[in-house]
Design a protein with these regions (language model features):
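Peripheral docking tails and interdomain loops at the edges
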Residues: 99, 105-149
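Conformationally flexible catalytic loops at phosphate/diphosphate-handling active centers
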Residues: 1-40
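Short acidic/histidine-rich motifs immediately flanking catalytic phosphotransfer sites
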Residues: 46-48, 97-100
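Hydrophobic alpha-helical scaffolding
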Residues: 7-18, 54, 101, 105, ...
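Redox- and metal-dependent alpha/beta enzyme cores, enriched for Fe-S-associated oxidoreductases
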Residues: 37-78, 84-91
Length: 149
């Protein structure tokens, strides 16, 4: 057996803790513009659909762009690299040029929730292709977009 450990809060009052948390929040807000990363593909023109995908699913989204272009569908892809901080302004600029949005993820809506929060107030239909724990191919993305036309 070992001797008992007596743990105590580092801060004696809630006010002390509040001050520290607010200082950390201020530092985060100051650093956020330097931390934000994203990539966008073909989002500089009006689009029929904007594909939003994060992580490995983005490779399939990029692969879907030429497939859609062959079929006369103007598509762009926005990939947030950082999710916190989320590149909200950049995502909103891209979304503003699209008639609708397709959120693709290999999870069950966690990324979708972040997207909805970031695009709150925009009048854009949002479709989804959610494949929890499974990969998504470029062909599946293109097929989902064609279904929604």
């Amino acid at each position: 057996d070992r001797p008992a450990q007596y743990l105590r809060n580092t801060y004696n009052t809630e006010e002390e803790l509040y001050d520290v948390v607010m200082e950390i929040a201020k530092d985060y807000e100051k650093a956020a513009p330097e931390i934000i990363e994203w990539q966008d593909f073909d989002t500089d023109v009006e689009m029929d659909v904007l594909i939003l995908a994060h992580g490995v699913v983005s490779r399939s989204a990029q692969g879907a762009l030429p497939l859609l272009k062959e079929q006369g569908i103007r598509a762009g892809h926005f990939r947030p690299i950082t999710l916190r901080p989320m590149p909200e302004e950049q995502m909103r600029r891209a979304a503003a040029k699209a008639k609708r949005i397709l959120v693709v993820e290999s999870a069950y809506g966690q990324f979708l929730k972040l997207v909805k929060q970031s695009l709150y107030g925009m009048d854009k239909p949002i479709d989804t292709l959610l494949r929890p724990g499974a990969g998504v191919t470029a062909e599946e993305i293109a097929d989902r977009i064609k279904e929604g036309r």
